[in-house]
UniProtKB/Swiss-Prot annotation:
It comes from the Eukaryota. InterPro entries: Atp25 (IPR040152), NT_sf (IPR043519). Keywords: Membrane, Mitochondrion, Mitochondrion inner membrane, Transit peptide. This is ATPase synthesis protein 25, mitochondrial. GO terms for biological process: mitochondrial gene expression; mRNA stabilization. It is a peripheral membrane protein. It comes from Ajellomyces capsulatus (strain G186AR / H82 / ATCC MYA-2454 / RMSCC 2432) (Darling's disease fungus).
Length: 731
């Protein structure tokens, strides 16, 4: 068809008729788009909502038509005022595209969400929480997201009530700062919040610090020195973003709702939920284990509120009612947790306690004067006052352990099988209730430390709970004795594998007691408590680490027992944390406490840490006297495996005379020194016989002369600890 001809036809309808007349000759059918006349005024384009592909298929169909004439113009003429028959009324109504309902297509989840699943939402979450988790995971890119719902904590955390905490791991320090900055900007822009990012450096501040650090590094390099400052204030590895208080999701106790009308107090109740996002690097998150600490706190709080009996108002207890059965139900020991907030008695109980009888019978000031041993022999003991806090401990320290275990009877509920128990509970019945409770706890602690099979730690924990629920005092001496009982453990070398570590249940009980002592105001950042925990988490025998796969075939080397490498590393991590607590709190140890730590490090084969601790004693100003040096050499003389640190050990011999005051080589020191030299150098006897001229042989001669002088002084009845004064010919 000529393009000029089509160009001359300006009417759209006329042009369509011309095209149809030519196409009909080639047997191609054209279906009309809509009903109506062929007039120019009534012709309109197809609706936009129709599918283009379907219209295209209808317009250009290659199937031949039965009647070519009908296919050319199949639209019948319609007179004015008449409607076509057989068509429904709905087809006449035109629905615009913006009024049609869109079909919701299934959204494809983001690929990052499949790799890093979001934590489940808690009960009654605030509306912002889901979008916040989505933004942190997908847009910011934090990994290993976890969520802790702390809204039920009672008392609430220091960050505020109704708290939800989110934890996330950044890929690096730079990613950490960028993520925190973007999160704060997103919260300000999207939700008009005012977040506070603790630990986040501003962009200009970060540039300034990096520029200063580079300048210091350049100056140090030119001066041929290194930067020794461990913390530059940039790489903290931890940023805490306080989102603030958002709407919805608050937790309210039922009793609070009932008392809301008659609420009397100061301030206003804050409605809403507080959200905090903890962003850390992977190393920092593993180091501080903040998530584990909050999770333990949450578990303790949830277990506390489950069925713990509250103290009831009652008259003061009479002396004869002490041994009656208590009303506290026997529950699982993990549910028997107490805090200061749950043990406050009411007014009647406080009045009864404060005005209770405090008198003591003057004739009952003894704990019995005789004891019957397992062999039937009677031993007379000196009387001791029951009010003395060390009377029981002093009594059982003066007798052998097997006799003490016999005096303690069958167990906790045994009160009359031995003469000691009969007299003990008779005196307890006449004592005030608070003193009687303290004495029973003291007796159980001593029995557990002696590893009596009838006295168990859960029973001791229940007795402590009863003591606390009665609002009795807990002194520091009682707390330390209770802590010793919970941390005491007798290793079982006959089991397979050997049991060398304190069970987790016992450690959990000890931590609960420490937690309660802290709530009562006792100082927990103390050297005594820190050393007890350091020894409590350690192995109770000499060990050496091996791989888990090699453990069944690993023999016992000397006195050292093989243990899994991952277990040994876990113990060392806990010890390292306790050491950092000591350094941060500037806690000073005594010489006896250093000896306990040195023995633990030596038993687990941490020789580098052993010698570092030995040097720290001198830096801390602790006097390394003769007892410490005897302990040092005796420790090495009892075991082997330390031969790679022989130089450090032998260097301690000339160091003794440089101490303040000097430590001279006497007979006792010379004997243990010779044993250590023999272990380190088995050929020392041959060298001495050949009279070789080396420092080791001269040291052997010095020890021999000191031993001979001590023996001669002992034979003459003189002091055997007289120092050995060496001559130049001995060196």
């Amino acid at each position: 068809m000529s393009r000029v001809l089509l160009r001359g036809i300006q009417c759209h309808a006329c042009r369509s008729n011309v095209i149809r007349s030519f196409i009909s000759l080639s047997d191609v059918a054209i279906t009309p788009l809509a009903g109506g006349s062929r007039s120019t005024a009534q012709a309109r384009p197809p609706p936009l909502s129709r599918n283009f592909s379907s219209q295209h298929a209808k317009l250009f169909s290659n199937q031949p038509s039965d009647n070519a004439e009908l296919s050319v113009d199949p639209i019948p003429e319609i007179h004015n005022g008449e409607e076509p028959e057989g068509q429904p009324e709905e087809s006449q109504e035109h629905i615009p595209w913006y009024l049609k309902e869109e079909q919701v297509e299934e959204t494809i989840p983001h690929p990052l969400r499949r790799q890093q699943p979001l934590p489940p939402l808690p009960e009654n979450p605030p509306p912002i929480l889901e979008n916040l988790l989505e933004h942190i995971s997908v847009d910011i890119g934090l990994d290993n997201l976890s969520l802790l719902d702390l809204r039920r904590l009672d008392p609430p955390p220091a960050l505020g009530a109704n708290l939800i905490m989110i934890f996330g791991t950044a890929r690096g320090v730079k990613h950490l700062n960028v993520s925190a900055d973007r999160l704060c900007r997103w919260l300000r822009t999207t939700y008009k919040l005012r977040p506070d990012a603790d630990g986040l450096l501003g962009r200009n501040e970060l540039k300034i610090k990096l520029r200063r650090k580079a300048r210091r590094a350049k100056l140090a390099k030119s001066a041929k020195s290194t930067l020794t400052q461990p913390d530059d204030g940039i790489t903290t590895g931890w940023i805490c973003v306080d989102v603030g208080t958002v709407e919805g999701g608050q937790f309210r106790k039922p009793e609070e709702e009932l008392r809301k009308v008659g609420f009397v107090g100061f301030g206003t109740v804050v409605e809403g939920t507080r959200i905090v996002v903890q962003m850390m690097t992977e190393e920092k998150r593993e180091e501080i284990d903040l998530e584990g600490l909050w999770r333990q706190k949450l578990e303790r709080n949830s277990l506390e509120n489950e069925g713990l009996p509250q103290p009831q108002a009652a008259a003061p207890q009479e002396a004869g009612d002490i041994h009656e059965q208590l009303t506290i139900p026997p529950t699982n020991i993990n549910h028997q947790i107490s805090h200061a907030t749950q043990i406050s008695p009411n007014y009647e109980q406080r009045r009864g306690i404060s005005t209770g009888s405090r008198y003591q019978d003057a004739t009952s000031d003894t704990w019995g004067t005789s004891r019957i041993s397992p062999n039937g022999e009677t031993t007379h003991l000196e009387p001791s006052a029951p009010s003395s806090p060390t009377s029981l401990s002093h009594r059982f320290k003066n007798i052998p352990p097997h006799e003490a275990i016999y005096d303690l009877g069958q167990g906790t509920h045994d009160r009359c099988s031995t003469a000691f128990l009969q007299q003990f509970y008779q005196e307890v019945a006449r004592a005030p209730s608070e003193l009687a409770s303290s004495r029973r706890i003291e007796l159980m602690c001593i029995a557990i430390e002696l590893h009596h099979p009838g006295y168990r730690k859960p029973d001791l924990f229940q007795a402590i709970q009863e003591h606390i629920l009665s609002n009795y005092a807990l002194t520091r001496a009682q707390f330390l004795q209770i802590l010793d009982a919970f941390l005491s453990f007798k290793p079982d070398l006959t089991s397979n594998p050997p049991r060398l570590l304190l069970p987790n249940a016992d450690m959990e009980l000890a931590l609960q007691i420490i937690d309660h002592a802290g709530l009562r105001g006792l100082n927990l950042l103390d050297s005594t408590i820190l050393v007890k925990l350091f020894v409590g988490v350690s192995f109770r025998a000499q060990v050496y680490p091996v791989e888990q796969k090699d453990l069944p075939n690993s023999p016992v080397i000397g006195n050292r027992i093989p243990v899994p490498l991952n277990t040994c590393d876990a113990v060392k991590r806990v010890q390292s944390r306790l050491t950092r607590v000591k350094t941060a709190a500037k806690i000073s140890f005594t010489a006896e406490q250093y000896m306990k730590i040195l023995r633990v490090l030596f038993d687990q084969g941490s020789y580098s840490g052993f010698w570092n601790t030995w040097e720290d004693m001198a830096l801390a100003g602790v006097a390394r006297d003769k007892a410490l040096y005897v302990f040092l050499f005796q420790l090495h003389a009892e075991s082997d495996g330390w031969q790679c640190f022989t130089t450090q050990l032998l260097n301690c011999i000339p160091m003794m005379e440089r101490e303040n005051p000097p430590v001279h080589l006497d007979g006792e020191l010379a004997e243990v020194t010779q044993k250590c030299i023999t272990i380190a150098y088995p050929e020392i006897i041959d060298r001495v016989e050949r009279n070789e001229q080396n420092p080791l042989v001269r040291m052997w001669h010095r020890c021999r002369v000191a031993i001979e002088n001590a023996a001669a002084a002992g034979g003459r009845g003189q002091d055997s600890t007289a120092p050995y004064v060496c001559n130049h010919s001995d060196i």
